[in-house]
Amino acid sequence: MGINARIQSENGDKIQELYDINNLVVKLLPSFNDESSICLRFIDPYGNTVFNQRQLPVFIIELKSAIAESTNLKAINHGDKLLKLAEKADGKVHTYLKFIGD
């Protein structure tokens, strides 16, 4: 199992979820030691990671770049779905993007 992503309310209520059954999110992530990454490197493949409204615009920019740089077609396709999910959450008060690691 991969790193699932969900939009959730501040109470933790699930609004929408994207499953990563083929472990594709990790193919878009930089190394944890990559200091040029502001958000993506902190997605924990084995734990939970939450991005708030101040972080989401930066996350979206980084994700677009990761998708553009990828050569893995399945990862690109999944990244596009993840991007749409993040954009849906962006700008919505008390709404978060949560990643649930394996």
Annotate each predicted stretch with a short phrase.
Residues 1-102:
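Acidic (Asp/Glu-rich) sequence patches and key acidic residues
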